[in-house]
């Protein structure tokens, strides 16, 4: 097992071990930060993931962003590839579970990732340099390779305990702004 695989396994177990109260408190803190800084997100093109399990919850965040005038896009896996497309959500949040149990938007209105203003990224763990370890398939790294990251705010959403010293980045890993 590689060091990265070990970190992934360890931090998934840690995340699965937190209480639902801790998850709820983390969500309250996230929503408070966004609410208190809503001018940074209003009227922007924002991609957010639809959280699962004990990831930092994003369901209310997606609704909040829509409510302040952001165009919200959710990732959708492209069949037989390691890439994502970013699909606009409608006001009803019409979603369908894919074969991995991840909720994805049903719509077809896509956006080129370079046209997004903000991309919220999930992670298993992250480091102070802005690198993250995901679930191990590289969907975000492959999908965002080649974007102009100087004009797109890449923000990792995570619980505080998920911060580590070094994620052992590889050449293909994208760097977030935190």
Annotate the PLM regions.
Residues 48, 121-122:
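Redox-cofactor binding/interface segments in oxidoreductases and associated redox assembly factors
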């Amino acid at each position: 097992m590689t060091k990265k695989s070990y970190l992934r396994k360890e931090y998934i177990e840690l995340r699965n071990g937190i209480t639902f109260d801790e998850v709820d408190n983390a969500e309250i803190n996230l929503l408070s930060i966004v609410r208190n800084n809503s001018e940074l997100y209003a009227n922007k093109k924002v991609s957010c993931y639809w959280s699962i399990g004990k990831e930092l919850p994003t369901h209310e965040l997606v609704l909040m962003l829509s409510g302040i005038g952001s165009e919200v896009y959710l990732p959708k896996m492209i069949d037989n590839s390691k890439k994502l497309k970013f699909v606009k959500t409608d006001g009803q949040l019409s979603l369908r579970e894919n074969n991995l149990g991840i909720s994805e938007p049903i719509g077809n209105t896509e956006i080129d990732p370079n046209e997004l203003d903000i991309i919220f990224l999930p992670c298993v763990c992250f480091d102070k340099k802005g690198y993250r370890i995901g679930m191990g398939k590289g969907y975000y790294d492959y999908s965002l390779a080649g974007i102009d990251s100087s004009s797109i705010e890449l923000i990792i959403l995570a619980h505080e305990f998920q911060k580590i010293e070094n994620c052992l980045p590889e050449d293909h890993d994208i760097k977030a702004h935190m």
